Structure formats: structure tokens, C-alpha cells
């Protein structure tokens, strides 16, 4: 329901009714921001925050993955911090290791650890300053820290801010919560160092983005399919015109389904779960065991313990137009 209210080019009647509450939200958020900035923690290690000003999935984690891979290729020593949304660790800060479950650290940290093959420290804490201090103490040779999300976590000083924008949803009706999808007013974009727009946006939206500096466009590119059970990798063309059921428990499943369709897969059914869904075997009851199941990397991490031989995830990369 909220999607129908928020993601319109212009606010509808209900959004207008909710606008007074949005003004209260903005006032509270501004006071919180000022209070946090007065006691900001400044690390000696440069910190880059990759976040957004809207709710929902915009593609932050793939951007973090891409940037960390670039730093590794330059022989740098990056580390990653995250809130660890939905995590149930015994203590914080919590370092992700090879034995860590997604339920302990959260979906995105688990996926990043797997994708980066344990090459970088990943530390989670609801208070990101704790995670930074843990890295400073335990990984003193770290020369850059990437924060997956946390743009509005002003307790932590940052050296660079990158905002990720979904080209399809953009900023919706451009109103703040609850009248619209924004966590902060759209004017906040004038303060950030870089904006990365993922997907193809309209000419009208490109005109809007001309008001902001350092806008980069990127698109999601399907790279390969990976078997969840065996980790076998195959070219995406292997699934051309093959029937498959698509599973998605992410913030914006439409993007995933579109990527599958662009890979010439014949999707016979789509099963959508809420973002950060804790998958169990019962979620797949009624699915023909002979048909191929395809899901996102983030979802696959949580299905490893009960995956079948014909379950795959689609790995992706970002094609950046610099």
C-alpha cells in the first residue's frame, strides 16, 4: 500500500494528509542529527559511507562489494562495517567469520563475507562507532573502512558519502516519511560527495539529477549462475529459455525479476517474500523438485543448509559509466 502512495511523481491526497506528520519527523531527525554530530567519533582511518536517503533496497551492498574489490586490486587493506540488520549475535561488536550464520550477522554481511572470500574484516554493531573501534584495535593496518548503509548514523564522522539511488523508484513523491519514502529531505543530496544511480532512469529524472554534483550511472549486469549446493558456476547463457521459479526476499524484487528476464529465462512463477525473510524449508513446499529454482545471492546465503541440486543464485556485477 505504501508503495502506491509513495512512488508517484506527485503526492496524492493521502500523502498531503500525512505531510504534517512528515514535518514533525524532519524536525525530530534534524535535532537527532545535530545532537549526534556534537559527539561525533572521528577515526584516523578514512571512512566511506555508502547509503541512501530513501527506504528500501537501492543497491548499496553491490556498490560496497564493487568498491572493496577495487581497493583489494590496488593492494589496499579495506574493512567493512555494518549495522547487521536483523542480526542476533551474542555480543557486539561482532566479527563475521567462516562459521558465522546469516542469522547471527545479518543478510548483507554474510553475503559480503562469502562474495569477498573472507579477504576483508567485516564487523557488525548497531552502534557503528563500536565496529570502527574494533577494527582500529584488531586490524590496525586497515587503510580504509567501508560502511554498508549508515548515512543517517551521524555519531560516526565520515570522509566521503556515497548515495545510491534506484533509477526506477528514484525519490518517489519526494516527501519524507510517512508521507513519502525519504529518510531526509532531497536537499541532502547537495551535501554528499557522489550519487550512483543504478538502472535506466527517465530523461525527466536525469534533468532533476543535473541539480546535483558528481552523478554516476550504473547498471546491474548478470555475470553467472552459481549452484547453491555445490558452488558450481555456469555462464548465464546456460539457462537461456529454461523454465525456472524465481524466489526473492529483497527490498525491491522487481529489479531481480527484470534481470532474470533480460537473461532470457522463462519464469514460470514468482515467489516474493519480505526483505530479510528468514527462509526455511517449508517456504519451498509445493515446488516441483524437478524444476529449476533461481534466487538472489542474498537469499541463497540463507538456503544453503537445505538447498537442492537444481537451486541456483544469479550473481551480478555493476557496470559503471564513469
UniProtKB/Swiss-Prot annotation:
**A GO-annotated cellular component:** plasma membrane
List its EC numbers.
2.7.1.130
InterPro entries xref list: LpxK (IPR003758), P-loop_NTPase (IPR027417)
Keywords of this protein's UniProt record, alphabetized?
A: ATP-binding, Kinase, Lipid A biosynthesis, Lipid biosynthesis, Lipid metabolism, Nucleotide-binding, Transferase
Query: Pathway it belongs to?
Result: Glycolipid biosynthesis; lipid IV(A) biosynthesis; lipid IV(A) from (3R)-3-hydroxytetradecanoyl-[acyl-carrier-protein] and UDP-N-acetyl-alpha-D-glucosamine: step 6/6
Q: What class of enzyme is it?
A: transferase
UniProt-annotated binding residues for ATP? 54-61
Catalytic activity, reaction form: a lipid A disaccharide + ATP = a lipid IVA + ADP + H(+)
Kindly list the biological process annotations in GO that this record carries. Answer: lipid A biosynthetic process; lipopolysaccharide core region biosynthetic process
Q: Which GO terms describe its molecular function?
A: ATP binding; tetraacyldisaccharide 4'-kinase activity
Q: Which NCBIfam families match?
A: lpxK (TIGR00682)
User: What does this gene product do?
Assistant: Transfers the gamma-phosphate of ATP to the 4'-position of a tetraacyldisaccharide 1-phosphate intermediate (termed DS-1-P) to form tetraacyldisaccharide 1,4'-bis-phosphate (lipid IVA).
Task: Give the family per the record.
Answer: Belongs to the LpxK family.
| Name by which UniProt lists this protein | Tetraacyldisaccharide 4'-kinase
- The species this protein was found in: Francisella tularensis subsp. holarctica (strain LVS)
In the UniProt record, the gene name given for this protein reads lpxK
Amino acid at each position: 500500500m505504501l508503495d502506491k502512495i509513495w512512488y508517484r511523481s506527485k503526492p496524492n491526497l493521502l500523502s498531503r494528509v500525512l505531510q504534517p506528520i512528515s514535518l514533525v519527523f524532519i524536525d525530530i531527525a534534524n535535532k537527532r542529527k545535530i545532537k549526534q554530530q556534537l559527539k561525533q567519533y572521528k577515526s584516523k582511518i578514512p571512512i566511506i559511507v555508502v547509503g541512501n536517503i530513501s527506504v528500501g533496497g537501492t543497491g548499496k551492498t553491490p556498490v560496497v562489494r564493487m568498491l572493496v574489490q577495487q581497493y583489494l586490486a590496488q593492494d589496499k587493506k579495506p574493512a567493512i562495517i555494518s549495522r547487521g540488520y536483523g542480526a542476533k549475535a551474542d555480543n557486539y561488536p561482532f566479527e563475521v567469520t567462516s562459521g558465522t550464520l546469516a542469522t547471527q550477522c545479518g543478510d548483507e554481511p554474510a553475503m559480503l563475507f562469502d562474495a569477498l572470500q573472507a579477504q576483508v574484516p567485516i564487523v557488525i554493531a548497531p552502534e557503528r562507532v563500536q565496529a570502527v573501534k574494533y577494527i582500529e584495535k584488531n586490524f590496525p593496518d586497515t587503510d580504509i573502512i567501508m560502511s554498508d548503509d549508515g548515512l543517517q548514523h551521524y555519531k560516526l564522522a565520515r570522509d566521503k558519502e556515497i548515495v545510491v539511488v534506484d533509477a526506477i523508484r528514484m525519490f518517489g513523491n519526494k516527501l519524507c516519511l510517512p508521507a513519502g519514502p525519504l529518510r531526509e529531505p532531497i536537499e541532502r543530496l547537495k551535501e554528499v560527495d557522489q550519487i550512483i544511480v543504478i538502472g535506466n532512469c527517465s530523461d525527466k529524472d536525469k534533468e532533476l539529477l543535473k541539480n546535483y554534483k558528481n552523478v554516476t550511472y550504473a547498471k546491474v549486469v548478470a555475470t553467472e549462475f552459481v549452484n547453491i549446493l555445490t558452488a558450481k558456476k555456469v555462464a548465464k547463457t546456460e539457462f537461456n529459455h529454461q523454465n525456472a521459479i524465481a524466489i526473492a526476499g529483497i527490498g525491491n524484487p522487481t529489479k531481480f525479476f527484470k534481470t532474470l528476464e533480460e537473461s532470457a529465462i522463462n519464469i514460470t512463477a514468482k515467489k516474493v517474500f519480505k526483505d530479510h525473510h528468514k527462509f526455511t524449508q517449508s517456504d519451498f513446499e509445493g515446488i516441483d523438485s524437478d524444476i529449476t529454482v533461481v534466487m538472489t545471492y542474498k537469499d541463497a546465503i540463507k538456503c544453503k543448509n537445505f538447498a537442492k541440486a537444481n537451486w541456483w543464485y544469479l550473481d551480478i556485477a555493476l557496470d559503471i559509466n564513469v
